[in-house]
Amino acid sequence: MDTSSLMEQILSSDNLNRAYLQVVRNKGAEGVDGMKYTELKEYLAKNGEIIKEQLRMRKYKPQPVRRVEIPKPDGGVRNLGVPTVTDRFIQQAIAQVLTPIYEEQFHEHSYGFRPNRCAQQAILTALDMMNEGNNWIVDIDLEKFFDTVNHDKLMTIIGRTIKDGDVISIVRKYLVSGIMIDDEYEDSIVGTPQGGNLSPLLANIMLNELDKEMEKRGLNFVRYVDDCIIMVGSEMSANRVMRNISRFIEEKLGLKVNMTKSKVDRPQGLKYLGFGFYFDSRAHQFKAKPHAKAVAKFKKRMKELTCRSWGVSNSYKVEKLNQLIRGWINYFEIGSMKTLCKELDARIRYRLRMCIWKQWKTPQNRIKNLMKLGVDKDIAWITAYTGSRIAYVCQRRVMNFAINKERLIQFGLVSMIDYYTKRCVTC
């Protein structure tokens, strides 16, 4: 494919219209100039032709990205760089033209930030490899990958494919556009900040070199952007692969391997893309399930949504719970979790009972509502006057009978086990 005149494809009306629609669809926060995505249309109407001419003449200067720190589950922070809306628009236009070119080069076992690919496909491929006897895992952790990409190495790799100097020029300008941290400017000497529309593609271009090296060595692997695992047949082979691939990453790609987090392990000790793995002795194969940390995160969020002191209606709590349940199961549906779903269902119902019991407030109101739900008057009276120990009351059999699964479903609650059973691909 001729890649010597790509700038005109990038600046074509059709490509720019698609880029605009995508940026507006993604919404997103303002960059350093404070412009909102809703203001982009008017801005481009006035300045679009000027921007196009600046890009053609290599005179366009991207603005610095705005640094935003996102807390990590492990206690650290992830640095995001938020470009201006205008720069997101231009980056999106570039990515739309470059992506089809690089899709022809990318490895079939690379799944992150690629069209029609997802984390679940990576997990299923990894399971296939494990069940073919490759049940020693090399889990390589790249230390602050997006913050440490070497610009010269990346541009050299891009230059092997892209021959349009105008495109090469603007991509490099985005890499060195700088960062604003609390109103202080900082040069971006290395890295491709997460948050830009080009960043995922540039990450895959860089790490495709790793994919090619692993393929050349005949290794079984899956990669989701910078999250890579290699499956081999023995512990000795796994340790050798860890040494050799780590050396390649550091010496050839100029990246840093975090040796304290990288490890050689069995599938049972692995956490990958939120999934854990176990060996099903009946089926004689490895299977996936939500990792314990993913379950703990779900429970924490569920507890927040069912907090009795949260001053919103119970119907609103159910609405938010349903969003959490659907999103979580949609992601983990390829995993085995029937028992887990039943346990979580029971926990959710228990916490909603406490919310409802508190909402009923007075003993008289509680007696009336329990009787409406079919509870005998004497039992309703005893239950209502048990005391203020809401957690204790809502564990009693009478409450399980009065506010049961069917009644909560009628109230609008999505049952995890029912939703999972409908969607599950492994049941």
Language-model regions: role of each:
Residues M1-A45, E49:
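Non-catalytic, polymerase-adjacent accessory regions of viral genome-replication enzymes
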Residues E30, G34-P100, E104, F113:
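Active-site substrate-recognition loop segments, prototypically the cytochrome P450 B′-helix/B-C loop
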Residues Q54-E69, P73, E108-R117, Q121-K271:
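Conserved polymerase palm-domain catalytic core
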Residues R88, Q92, Q96, P100, ...:
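Short, residue-level hotspots on alpha-helical faces of the histone-fold
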Residues V176, K252-K320, L324-R326:
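A conserved non-catalytic segment of reverse transcriptases
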Residues W360-C427:
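Extended C-terminal regions of large enzymes
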